[in-house]
Amino acid sequence: MKVKPSVKTVCEKCKVIRRKGKVVIICSNAKHKQRQG
């Protein structure tokens, strides 16, 4: 899980979702997991 000030989708499988007010990117590729904060 990368924590970044700005999150962007890396590939077409990345999905942007909101969890508890935070922007989270989930993907089938575990390296693409990101969280804003």
From Swiss-Prot:
It comes from the Bacteria. One of its GO terms (biological process) is translation. It holds the Pfam family Ribosomal_L36. One of its GO terms (cellular component) is ribonucleoprotein complex. Keywords: Ribonucleoprotein, Ribosomal protein. InterPro entries: Ribosomal_bL36, Ribosomal_bL36_sp. GO terms for molecular function: structural constituent of ribosome. HAMAP family: Ribosomal_bL36 (MF_00251). Belongs to the bacterial ribosomal protein bL36 family. PANTHER family: 50S RIBOSOMAL PROTEIN L36, CHLOROPLASTIC, LARGE RIBOSOMAL SUBUNIT PROTEIN BL36C. This is Large ribosomal subunit protein bL36. It comes from Desulforudis audaxviator (strain MP104C).
